[in-house]
């Protein structure tokens, strides 16, 4: 009798042959622009901690205080025994920050997308998503049971064509897009997309994971950055990137949030966000609004990185995500290792995560000019 698990080993062999195999890289220090990787100090260009808050003493102390008051875990779902006053404080703060009526906090950003999409649409509905959307948007779409169609990346003509051809055949239509695309660094054309949604009576859910805390006059995200704050849409984001904590949120109308509390399975049937993570995120929101100089420094650092990488094949980017395009996974792995040997941590990103191989640099407000000089010396 054949072993029913033998296929796993063969699949791993295929990954190795294609140079698609992945393994973790262990960091042995606090989050920061310089970290301890395998016993060596390296400059960290791989973190989503855009504002350098994950290692901030104020977040750490807020988390400790919350743990002392409420314990380490929420111990139940929010609808049973897992709700604490600090959860509602955070949700109110997010709603104020995002200029929406209300907000709801999930235990992760991935869960926020899965739960929201599957609550909003079903078998009689249509989902139209940007082909470069995050995995959580794509998997939420599959789980919903709706008909799912991708439109070409950032191509609103293609989106319009699909709306003309298919919208009338479905009860509801949900358009999904990242606002900042995490593996490319570009931004969606949100104002025009919202115009299309209004023309065809569609809902819109935007993923602000890499925009929250970074984009916009106050750091509220691309919705603010693109002057769309007063328009009707659903805003999702994370607490784990610029906010330096863990969790996800959805912000929108009172009715939307009340509906999700009753229909989003990934909120109803999972343990509430831990008190420590909740307190850290709440503290980060306050810091982001009180210290705009962090964002200013981040944008200055974006300019410094682009100076050092002038002449290389950089993807178009208006964000702190800068990608250097390469021809093959092997080239990406070789360059990533060269950088690491020179004290630079910037991992290779390869298929199937992305269509083409690249080195992805993410910037932090806490990077120093000498870090960029070092990068320039190593990469050339």
UniProtKB/Swiss-Prot annotation:
Pathway(s) it belongs to: Cofactor biosynthesis; biotin biosynthesis
PROSITE patterns: AA_TRANSFER_CLASS_2 (PS00599)
Cofactor annotation: pyridoxal 5'-phosphate
Residue numbers binding substrate: 22, 134, 353
Any GO BP: biotin biosynthetic process
InterPro entries: Aminotrans_II_pyridoxalP_BS, Aminotransferase_I/II_large, AON_synthase_class-II, AONS_Archaea/Proteobacteria, PyrdxlP-dep_Trfase, PyrdxlP-dep_Trfase_major, PyrdxlP-dep_Trfase_small
Modification N6-(pyridoxal phosphate)lysine occurs at: 241
Entry's EC annotation: 2.3.1.47
Assembly and binders: Homodimer.
Record protein name field: Putative 8-amino-7-oxononanoate synthase
Organism: Gloeothece citriformis (strain PCC 7424)
């Amino acid at each position: 009798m054949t072993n029913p698990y033998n296929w796993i080993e063969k699949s791993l062999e295929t990954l190795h042959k294609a140079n698609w195999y992945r393994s973790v890289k262990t960091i042995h220090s606090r989050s920061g622009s310089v970290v301890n990787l395998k016993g060596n100090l390296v400059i960290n260009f791989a973190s989503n901690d855009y504002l350098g808050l994950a290692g901030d003493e104020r977040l750490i102390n807020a988390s400790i205080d919350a743990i002392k008051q409420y314990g380490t875990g929420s111990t139940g779902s929010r609808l049973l025994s897992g709700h604490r006053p600090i959860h509602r404080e955070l949700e109110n703060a997010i709603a104020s920050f995002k200029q929406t009526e209300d907000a709801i906090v999930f235990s992760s950003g991935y869960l926020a997308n899965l739960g929201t999409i599957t609550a909003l649409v079903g078998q009689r509905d249509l989902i139209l998503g940007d082909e470069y959307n995050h995995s959580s948007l794509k998997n939420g779409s599959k789980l919903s049971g709706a008909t799912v169609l991708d439109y070409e990346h950032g191509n609103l003509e293609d989106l319009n064509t699909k709306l003309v051809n298919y919208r009338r055949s479905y009860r509801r239509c949900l358009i999904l897009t990242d606002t900042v695309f995490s593996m490319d660094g570009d931004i969606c054309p949100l104002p025009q997309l919202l115009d299309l949604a209004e023309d065809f009576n569609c809902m819109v859910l935007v993923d602000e994971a890499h925009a929250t805390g970074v984009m916009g006059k106050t750091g509220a995200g691309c919705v603010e950055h693109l002057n769309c704050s007063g328009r009707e849409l659903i805003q999702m984001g994370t607490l784990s990137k610029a906010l330096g904590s863990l969790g996800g949120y959805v912000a929108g109308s009172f009715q939307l949030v009340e509906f999700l509390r009753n229909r989003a399975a990934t909120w109803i049937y999972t343990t509430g966000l831990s008190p420590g993570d909740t307190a850290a995120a709440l503290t980060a929101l306050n810091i982001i609004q009180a210290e705009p100089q962090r964002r200013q420094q981040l944008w200055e650092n974006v300019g410094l990185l682009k100076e050092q990488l002038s002449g290389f094949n950089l993807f178009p980017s208006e964000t702190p995500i800068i990608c250097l395009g390469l021809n093959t996974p092997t080239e990406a792995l070789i360059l990533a290792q060269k950088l690491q040997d020179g004290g630079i941590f910037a991992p290779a990103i390869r298929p199937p995560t992305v269509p083409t191989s690249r080195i992805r640099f993410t910037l932090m407000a806490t990077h120093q000019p000498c870090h960029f000089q070092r990068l320039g010396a190593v990469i050339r």
